[in-house]
């Protein structure tokens, strides 16, 4: 369920079905990034329609689905292959998009010369050798795209799924077994951030995780503990990513938003990096409507939290998703689904509110009045000095008019 405390009316995207404006049109007006995971190997770069067209028309941020992972960029030790990652950069130039790099240190899609399964140390590398391998990889890959890739997922999915340790120690977390964690130790995370920052001091650095989206889960708490530790260690960490691979019926918007906001209290961004929402029951009559409502609810959270600067969906169309049961915004024929139209509607309404809320509502033909000051009140009518959450705004204009609105931030 949505939290019920939103400035937007109930999900109503009917009028958006006749609109030709893109998602990025509104996102850019709001200073937000709406992004997509692209698979460059599927595209005909001579074309501008179809899936490649949607990638550029609808989204102002792009991330390679697989192109920048370890096995793709360094298939053999010291031999780097940038064909796929360069293709993502080419697309970003063509469509004027911000680029996310994904990912530098992960337990999956590790080349066989490092590990046969991401866990085994088949070649009996020493700790020092593994650190050198990781360092060389990061300096080469990040260095190649210095000044071109805006932000990187430095480490991906480092936590074990079993975080029962949090129940006995609320500040604890447990790393998953991997070639990096088992044979180097936790310092591989810190080292990776240090090296990525050295390779490109201007790049924004993130850690990324799944299953840690909503407060109350042990993995969510463990992730918070780890991210807090990294921040307090003085590392150049911009924020954390929540993958948000959901199935309809799983989402609790209040718990998701509470999680995002507590990272803001740490001075960190908390962004949505791999959003998709699979249908719990594709045969249900209201399956697509339920999916649309959840996409809309997440979009509202994205829009009203300043530290959630980006929201990326993990793919374009249902037939090319890594998941079953139609989790994306476009169907197998590249037709927009209700989920797309509700994301569009929430972006549009946010822009409309932004553009109309800064002027006097008077329509008597006089020039718009200038806003003098805004006073915020909580739901009890008490003035707020640092407004967050549900609030009432009273806007005072130089023509004597006063506008009172309810909003959520």
For each predicted feature, which ranges?
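Acidic-and-aromatic substrate-binding clefts and catalytic sites of carbohydrate-active enzymes
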Residues: 37-49, 70-83, 159-161, 212-222, ...
